[in-house]
Design a protein with these regions (language model features):
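Polybasic low-complexity intrinsically disordered regions
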Residues: 1-48, 52-54
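Generic, well-ordered alpha-helical scaffold segments in large soluble proteins
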Residues: 11, 35-42, 68, 104-107, ...
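Short, acidic/turn-prone active-site loops that include or flank metal/cofactor-
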Residues: 23, 76-81
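Acidic, metal-coordinating catalytic cores used for nucleic-acid/nucleotide bond scission
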Residues: 51-59, 79-80
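Short glycine/threonine-rich loop-to-helix capping motif typified by GTGT followed
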Residues: 59-67
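Short hydrophobic/aromatic-enriched beta-strand-loop microsegments
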Residues: 68-77
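Short, charged, surface-exposed secondary-structure boundary motifs
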Residues: 81-89
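Basic, amphipathic alpha-helical segments enriched in Lys/Arg and hydrophobic/aromatic residues
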Residues: 89-162
Length: 162
């Protein structure tokens, strides 16, 4: 996406909690637990569930998620296994939600980093990504506050009517 491999992790509200740009191409399945550790260290909260694309799926990752009492929403590599997992309501719902993450990468890339990204060299691309994530998250927080303000009068009216 960025001329280098980028890992983006977000919460259900769309706020990016973890990102990393890699100089060399890295296997997705090897990146998962470093990301979860950074989220835990940064927020102090245990991740309740992980939803990814096929690149992150591995028996070792699924086993470790189970041992950590974290919902395993890793998209299976085998289509038959994916069809089977899509019968599970929570898995299917979270996989549909994952499509928003793909869109989030597009928003980050085109809306906040520019197309093409003008930063040359790894250090400058890494810095541009950091600024892009910060700007994106400020935008998301402002949108969340705006939505909350719109909902507040309705809640007050409903409470007054009760």
């Amino acid at each position: 996406e960025f001329g280098n491999t980028a890992l983006i992790g977000e919460n259900r509200q769309g706020v990016i909690l973890d990102y990393q740009l890699f100089r060399e191409s890295a296997a997705d399945s090897q990146l998962l637990f470093e990301s979860l550790l950074r989220v835990w260290e940064g927020t102090g909260h245990h991740v309740e569930g992980v939803v990814t694309d096929r690149g992150f799926a591995s028996a070792a990752n699924s086993r470790a998620l189970k041992e950590g009492n974290t919902f395993d929403g890793l998209c299976p590599r085998k289509p038959a296994k994916l069809s089977q997992r899509m019968q599970e309501e929570k898995f299917a719902r979270l996989q549909r939600r994952r499509a928003q993450t793909e869109a989030r990468i597009g928003i980050l890339k085109h809306g906040f980093l520019g197309q093409p990204m003008r930063a040359k060299g790894f250090a400058h691309r890494e810095l541009a990504l950091a600024w892009g994530v910060l700007t994106h998250n400020l935008w998301m927080l402002a949108r969340m506050r705006k939505i909350k303000k719109k909902a507040a009068p309705k809640a007050v009216l409903l409470q007054a009517a009760a």
